[in-house]
Amino acid sequence: YNIAPMNPPVSTVELTGGEIKEMLEENLERSFSCNPLGQMGGYVKRCLGLQVNLRIENPKGHRIQEIYYKGRHIDFEKTYKVSFVTTQGVASKYGKNRKKYDINAVEAMKDYLKENSNFAPGNKESFRLV
């Protein structure tokens, strides 16, 4: 349970594909900024269900080359319902229709692993350098 040591509640929010890209680009800039003062956090967001092809060396706003959801390019105009824990997962400036649930992260993770017993952390490529 080291990934969610405080065991926060699970929340959902509706994000457009464009917001997903903007949020991930912002996160990549805060992790890989050429300006050391722009580096805030030092980690790439963890996600399951997306595959992001990126070029770390590209300038701010141009690192993400492609984003796939369920094997298809995301539609920047379409709205997707996503789950997350804490506003570090999805900042409050993104999305609409936020909802906090009565289930906490550890319980949700246990339920997910029961339903997906073949899941292994190493078998998902969320972020891929191209």
Q: What are these language model-derived features?
A:
Residues Y1-V130:
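Feature captures C-terminal
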